[in-house]
Amino acid sequence: MMSYSARILSAYEKKVSLYEILSEKISALLEGLIQDEGLYVHSIYHRVKQRDSLSRKLNKPDASYKKLGDLTDIAGVRVITYFSSDVDRVADIIRREFTVDTEHSIDKGALLDPDRFGYLSLHYVVSLGKSHTKFPQDKQLASLKAEIQIRSILQHAWAEIEHDLGYKSKHAIPIHMRRRFSRLSGLLELADYEFDGLRTNLREYSEEVAAAQGIDIPLDKISLTHVIKHGDLVRMLDNEIRNQTGLELVFEDWFAESLIEKLLFVGISRLSDLEAGLRHRSDVITRFAIEHLKGRTYSRIHRGVSIYYFCTGLLAESGNEDRLLEYLETFRLGEPANRKRFARGIIEKYQSAGDPHG
């Protein structure tokens, strides 16, 4: 008579291809559902337990499995989020879209005593449910279960390091090292909490910037991006440069961020100073930009291009070639071997733009 273990392994070999289809399908579904929710996660993995791994699990002293269906982690999917609060948002999607086996699902965070060493994650045992098994080829998947793990990226880092070190229980750790493990666990949990808080604060600040019309605020990525996207003056100047050059005008996050250091280099640290400088030099900035872009092989320019030429123009306006050269070298503008000539050309073009009749 075959043992339970042998029967399960035999059933596994017959159904392993179905479990592979199941894990891949759940992974693809989650990817689409998470994207539809407007969430961005670090990664989604799927796997099927290997035969050797299954055999070891079945032969553990406390194993009590009698059939393949008793094992709920043959197919597995892992979702790793950037933020711990997104773990709960992914969990909401899973509860809404899949049939959850609550008896076998685990919230590991709820199992932790305050003084117990360990870390958090959610484990849901699910089946596809009727909404995701409408097609005939999916019917054979309906009775199968899979385990979905959800962790933040820091929770995942802890779990991986913990596994690599080989200590999953605080009692297995040498007593003189337990405090160090506990401190590390607490630090990671605190870091998760702080990253969540930072994201919330950045969102709130972004809303404050959007509402702060006419209020002077410091220059940073959020405030400058808002000006580039929504500021009337910058939009007018950028559009004029686009119209005169015929180049496509696009917004790219990296370009907006690169302007911050350039503005700080020329002494602009507040939006009020930027606004005043642009307004005072609006005509010369557009003429300078249009002249400088003549003959270039660019197919497009970036929103905020007027600010880029404002920074260069401020230095050209001073006539200080050494300072302009330092600026070009700092931001790696122009060919290194020709930067002196490039700097002189910038000054000449700016002076010419400042005298439209010259």
Where are each of the predicted segments found?
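Short acidic, glycine/proline-enriched loop segments that cap or flank alpha-helices
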Residues: 67, 134-136, 247, 251
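Charge-rich, low-complexity segments
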Residues: 1-74, 81, 85, 211, ...
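Amphipathic, soluble alpha/beta structural segments
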Residues: 113-136, 176-209, 286-329
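The conserved glycine-aromatic submotif of the RRM
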Residues: 75-76, 120
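An acidic, glycine-/histidine-flanked metal-binding catalytic module
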Residues: 2-12, 16-18, 142-283, 358
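Long beta-strand-rich cores associated with HINT superfamily self-processing modules
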Residues: 81-197
